[in-house]
């Protein structure tokens, strides 16, 4: 899936992840950002990172909010647990300090709750359609890449409720054997 909980069972199943990108009619990201439920956790709408801009590209930024949807972690449903502003969908994007600004790297290194998985391009066997496009998860190169124009977010904000995690008290012998 697009996101995977670090904790199995009810804790992982309590999580929701919401992304706000730059896709809206004026290309600034402000229309979707202003309507986004988690706007208050971020300073401004996503746009273009300085790294991608320096290569002539645009619209690579997203905001990611990790939410305690059911209140299992914080005690209050709907609490924003983590906010990741101005991440890039370009796989080689760098922050101003030289570290990776690629959303999968940042989430893997910093999140206490989730990993970023694979998005469903076009539609999967269940008919899921997270987005369609070719530029996400590719390297930014010199030229006029427009990461936003290749992404169809619908409203520009996608939200995933994590489900399917199972709690287990202990592993049996066959569980260990299947693991090797």
Predicted features along the sequence, with ranges:
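Surface-exposed assembly/interface segments
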Residues: 1-180
